[in-house]
Regions:
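Charge-rich (acidic/polar
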Residues: 21-132
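Bacterial Sec-dependent N-terminal signal peptides
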Residues: 1-28
């Protein structure tokens, strides 16, 4: 029994140590902006805008936050890769269209038909070349 308790304590201790070594994705610097903005700040801003624009309910907010987090992280990583390989407007636009289209598809599961229709209409105004 004493061995089991010791093993559990060690396991919990090591798992906490491992988690502490990985910085939160929200504290990571947003590469595209030079003003010190973090990914978390961008997520907060997009979530606030989507909440107002789509009239998200309290039940939809956690799932929407996850969708937005995935999209912002994917965009941030894509910009990092583009900077390393040579970035231009066409590549950046292609990345934005791909990430935003995927975000719209992920949103479909959590939005009502009215909310989704409004989102698709807004998306098609911004990205007419998109295939939603």
């Amino acid at each position: 029994m004493k061995t089991l308790i010791t093993a559990i304590i060690l396991l919990v201790g090591y798992s906490n140590l491992t988690v502490a070594q990985n910085p939160s994705v929200e504290n990571e610097k947003f590469v595209f902006l030079n003003n010190g903005a973090t990914v978390g700040m961008i997520i907060k801003s997009v979530l606030k805008a989507d909440k107002q624009r789509l009239k998200l309910t309290d039940q939809q907010l956690p799932k929407a936050r996850q969708v937005i987090t995935n999209a912002v992280v994917k965009y941030n990583e894509g910009v990092k890769k583009l900077k390393a390989s040579g970035m231009n407007q066409k590549k950046l636009r292609t990345l934005a269209v791909a990430v935003e289209t995927e975000k719209v598809h992920e949103y479909k599961a959590i939005l009502t038909n009215e909310q989704y229709t409004a989102l698709v209409a807004q998306h098609m105004k911004m990205y007419p070349e998109s295939k939603v």
